[in-house]
UniProtKB/Swiss-Prot annotation:
One protein family per Pfam: Ribosomal_S8
Record-annotated membrane-spanning stretches: none
Natural source organism: Lepidium virginicum
Gene: rps8
Family stated for the protein in its record: Belongs to the universal ribosomal protein uS8 family.
Gene3D superfamilies: 3.30.1370.30, 3.30.1490.10
Top-rank taxon: Eukaryota
Task of the protein: One of the primary rRNA binding proteins, it binds directly to 16S rRNA central domain where it helps coordinate assembly of the platform of the 30S subunit.
A biological process term (GO) from this entry: translation
Quaternary structure note: Part of the 30S ribosomal subunit.
Keywords: Chloroplast, Plastid, Ribonucleoprotein, Ribosomal protein, RNA-binding, rRNA-binding
One GO MF term: structural constituent of ribosome
Protein's recorded name: Small ribosomal subunit protein uS8c
One GO cellular component term: ribosome
InterPro entries assigned to the protein according to its UniProt record, in alphabetical order: Ribosomal_uS8 (IPR000630), Ribosomal_uS8_CS (IPR047863), Ribosomal_uS8_sf (IPR035987)
Amino acid sequence: MGKDTIADIITSIRNADMNRKGTVRIRSTNITESIVKILLREGFIENVRKHRENNQYFLILTLRHKRNKKESYKTILNLKRISRPGLRIYSNSQRIPRILGGIGIVILSTSQGIMTDREARRKSIGGEILCYIW
């Protein structure tokens, strides 16, 4: 049975966000680095740094939390894995879904790398729908 690194990163971020943790540590792979760069660029996380421990690289993510007037934390991150190893979901450029009317993003794996739905529509390419983030 193989590991699903995308599901692992999504679950780690979701659990840390629900438990109001400030940081998350995930294993560094090419796919996770691409997804984290998109999350950083879109403003879903604050900071990323690479850490080496016992000849393995890890990414330390600093999550973005929002406080309301009662000084309690409000989670602002919702992630959902779409395509998985047992059921791959593909979409062409015309049928890429919009999340909350464009507020959320769809992360796709295309022939030109991992990118958001807006970039894929602009380049008119489709691919495998990895996850939704809103």
